[in-house]
Amino acid sequence: MTDSNNWYIEHFERTGSAIGYRITGKLDEVQSPFQKIEIFRTTDWGNLMTIDGAIMLTSKDNFFYHEMISHPVLFTHAAPKRVVIIGGGDCGTLREVLKHKGVESVTQCDIDEQVTVMARKHFPELCDSNDDARAELLFDDGVAYMANCPAGSVDVVIVDSTDPVGPGEGLFNKAFYASCFKALKDDGILVQQSESPLMQLELINEMRTEMGKAGFGSFKTLPFPQPCYPTGWWSVTLARKGESSFDFRQADSAAKTFETLYYTAALHTGVLVTPPFVQAALK
């Protein structure tokens, strides 16, 4: 919500906290069949996107999330060639995945085309790989897409979803994870944004439990900073179909030729060390 002093403030009842940005005005808004998308100009954080009032990203800090949902999983897989992104309509994750030249094809399936339309207009830097020949952008139900995905056809599934409410609700249960499990090859990996490890460990445990019911045998939750999300600390959770190790191709990561603003091989090594309070709470 905006107040009379030109601040956009989102209150988080479940964490008893709030995040605010000083704004100079609203740049755009659209009511899609699924949700309301708004774009604001801030004084210090670039453009701000909200969906149904919830802060999604800013120009200044989205790289933390997009890099950490993409590069750790792709360097953990031995040779990822076929990638599916469920959600991801702002296209920042797609851009990061396509930095990996060994990836041969990426299908992104987001239910709401208007998210991508607004991203192209107001976050063009996130969409500069949308026309890559390896990319396929679909605007459809991600749950249905994964249910119909051929068995054993995918190396990595990235679930770049909103919170588990509204359009994103169906992406956090056993049935959806079972579809991902079926679609993945024997050495395939699923990764999904998994909320704040400081305040939402119960949700992370629920996700891991549902993933386990779907057949996944090992999990790793990686925390990272994300200033625009509740608590400023976020996470992604990886689930392996086959082997249990989350070792990564450290030499390849260290020798990467593309630019990142946060992710490095050294950082990847460090983030594999789970903080004691998180480890104690995880099942």
UniProtKB/Swiss-Prot annotation:
S-methyl-5'-thioadenosine binds at Q35, D110, D141, G142, P167. The active site is at D160. One of its GO terms (cellular component) is cytosol. Its EC number is 2.5.1.16. Pathway: Amine and polyamine biosynthesis; spermidine biosynthesis; spermidine from putrescine: step 1/1. Keywords: Cytoplasm, Polyamine biosynthesis, Spermidine biosynthesis, Transferase. One of its GO terms (biological process) is spermidine biosynthetic process. Residues 5-241 form the PABS domain. InterPro entries: PABS, PABS_CS, SAM-dependent_MTases_sf, Spermi_synthase, Spermidine_synt_N, Spermidine_synt_N_sf. It catalyses: S-adenosyl 3-(methylsulfanyl)propylamine + putrescine = S-methyl-5'-thioadenosine + spermidine + H(+). Spermidine binds at H66, D90, D160, S161, T162, D163. SUPFAM superfamilies: S-adenosyl-L-methionine-dependent methyltransferases. It is found in: Cytoplasm. Pfam families: Spermine_synt_N, Spermine_synth. GO terms for molecular function: spermidine synthase activity. PANTHER family: SPERMIDINE SYNTHASE (PTHR11558:SF11), SPERMIDINE/SPERMINE SYNTHASE (PTHR11558). Belongs to the spermidine/spermine synthase family. Catalyzes the irreversible transfer of a propylamine group from the amino donor S-adenosylmethioninamine (decarboxy-AdoMet) to putrescine (1,4-diaminobutane) to yield spermidine. Homodimer or homotetramer. This is Polyamine aminopropyltransferase. It comes from Stenotrophomonas maltophilia (strain R551-3). The gene is speE.
